[in-house]
Amino acid sequence: MILRYIPYIQTNFVLGLDGDNGTEPFELTRKFIDLAPGAFPAYSLLSAFGRAAPLNLEYQRAGRVLPFPFHFLNNNHAMNVRPKHYSWPEFYDGLIDVTRYSFSWRAIARRVPATATAIPKWMNVVRAMSSEGWGRIEYHTKIRRLLDTDRSVRDYLEGETNVLPAFYHDRIRRELGPLYEYLPDGAVYHDPNAYLESASQTPAAEPVSLRSRRAG
């Protein structure tokens, strides 16, 4: 009904929230895709961005925030909060499944007639076939494979080491190209618990008594 009045709709989902458990969140998302074929789904991975939300303090107290370089904190190339109710393989299996379902030829074909005007129709097709759709399926599938085959990636995601795996380091070097050499020392590392540490160092406010001024 909304598409009668608004030519293009994108629906945003955040995957990996603490309330998510089991297969149900992924199954319900697939159900949404079936019931609202005209809406373009955009999936984001749970991320803690510094002081962006007080909830980040809880993640840091629990030791769940990972030191991913800022280069990857774009909501889809890395999830810097360890999921509460999933192992990493379980989470990526669900993520890949729902992403494949959302950008399958069947879903793309149903999205076209559900959209009224020509430009939004083609935008849905192009976005699904680009890095936003098929590209992310390929990337997430690669991460899932590395979880089984590259111990450095698995240890990093489990929070057992803060040494950035070669896979991520090489990607930064490749994407920055000639600009990579200008990165300062330590640019790919940061303290993931800086917010918590700064909050614990903030001095407590002392009560101040206000005395009424005596009439002269």
Question: For each predicted feature, which ranges?
Answer:
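A structural motif corresponding to the C-terminal lobe/cap of the Radical SAM core domain
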Residues: M1-P120, N124, L146-D148, L196-E197, ...
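C-terminal non-catalytic accessory extensions
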Residues: W134-G216
